[in-house]
Amino acid sequence: MDWVEKYRPQHLQDVVGNSGAVRLIYEWARDWSRQKKPLILYGKPGTGKTSSAYALANDMNWEVVELNASDQRTKAALERVAGAGSTTASLSGASRKLILLDEADNLHGQADRGGAKAIVEIIAAAQQPIILIANDYYSLTRELKAVTEPVQFRALQARSIVPRLRQICAAEGVACDPAALDDIANRAGGDMRAAVNMLYAAAIGKEHLAAGDVHTSAKDERSTIFELVGATFKGKRDADLLRMAVEVEDTPDAIEQWLEGNLDHMPDLASRAEGYACLARADEYIGRTYRRQYYTLWRYASAVMLLGVADAAGGHGVHGRIMPPSRWQKMGASKKQKAVRAGLSRKLSEMTHIPQDALREDFFTAITILVERDPATYVREFDLDADELNLFIHDKARATKVVKEVAKEEKEKAKKAAAKEKAPTKGKKSRDDDPPADTGESRRDPSPGQATLF
C-alpha cells in the first residue's frame, strides 16, 4: 500500500494547511440544507482537496459516492450514479450521502458528453450534499459556477509539509535527517502528495534517510503553460524561457495563442504592437513547419515569440489573471451551439415525425414565431432546456428564467398529484367510469408519440 493512501487524513483536524478552507467546508456541512449551494474545492494538485472531502464525510458520518475522470461521465452515467445518490437516502446507516465529483474541470470531450449540463441538473434536484473537485476553477462552465460556491486550496508551505513527513518516518521506523525532509518539502512545490511519494521512493527499504538519498526521487518539475506565460512577461532569462518551452506539454502554435490572448498585460500600446509583431514572425515559422513537415523550425518559432514578447514586456509582469486564448472560448461556444441545434432538430423530428431537413428548411421559422409568443407552453410541449429555448428567443437570461419557472410549476403539480393520490377516496363514481357516448362521429387523433406543432 502506498504511503499517500496509508497516511491520508481521516479527520479534518489532520489536514495539513489551508485551515481557512477547512473551516469553511466544515461550517457548510454542519449547517447543510437543500438551500445551500454545492462546494467546488479548487487549487493545485496535492493541496488536500480530495482528502478534505473524505475527512469531512468521515467526521459527519456521511457515505461517499464518488465519480472521477476514469469513469464514463456521460449525461446518462452521471444521472444514473450521482443523480440517484443525490436524491435517495443511505442504506448503510450513514446520516447522509456526500456526492463527490473529482476532476470536475476535466468535463470535456466525447466521453463526458453532456456531463456539465447533467451536473447542473443534478444540483438543482439534489437532496444530498455535493462537493466538486477541480484544479482550474476558471476552466469551469459559467452555468456550473453560478450554482456552486468556490473554496480555494492554496499550495502548502514547506514548513507545513515537514512535520507530516516526520510523522510518517516515525510511523514507518525510518530515521530521517532534518536536511532530507527539508529538501523533500522544498522540492515538492507545495504538493503534499508529491512530497509523500518522494519520501516513499527515497526511504523504501532503508532504516535511515540521508539528504543524499533524496535526489533520486525528485518530483517531476515540468513547467505549465501558466508558468511559461508568467515567466515571459516577467522577463526571465532567455535560457530559462527556452527550457520551459520544451517542458510544457503545449506545442509552439498553442503557446503562440496563449501569448496572444494575454498581450493585454503589456504596459502600453507600443509594447503590445511590438509583441504582436514578434508573434506574427513566429507564426510564419509555424506555418512553414506544417507546410514542409520540417519540425526543426519550431525551435525558431519558440525563440522568436518568447524572447520577443519578453523583451517587449520589459519585465512588467502579469497584473491580473492569465487567461486561455479567447479564440478557444469562441470555438467552444460555436461548437456547443451547433450541438444544441442538432439535438433540438433530432428531438423535434422524433416528436413530430417530420424529417430534420424539412423541419429546418420549412418549419423552423414558423416554430420560432410560435415559441417567441408563448415560450412556456412550448417548453412543456417539447421539453426544451434553456439552451434549446435560447435558439428560438435569442435571450439567454429570459430562456433560463422561463425554464426554471416551468420546472417549478411542474414540480408543484407533481406534489399536488401525489398528495391527491394519498388522500382517501369516498367511493364516488367518476364520470370517467362511464363509457363514452357514441355520437357517430369519427375522430382523427395524432398517432401515438406524435406531437402537433399548430
Swiss-Prot record:
Record-annotated residues binding ATP?
Answer: G43, K44, P45, G46, T47, G48, K49, T50
- One MF term in the entry's GO annotations: DNA clamp loader activity
Q: Basic and acidic residues: which segments have biased composition?
A: 408-446
Kindly give the CDD domains that the UniProt entry links to this protein.
AAA, HLD_clamp_RFC
Q: Which UniProt keywords apply?
A: ATP-binding, DNA replication, Nucleotide-binding
Purpose: Part of the RFC clamp loader complex which loads the PCNA sliding clamp onto DNA.
Q: What is the protein's name according to its record?
A: Replication factor C large subunit
Gene name tied to this protein: rfcL
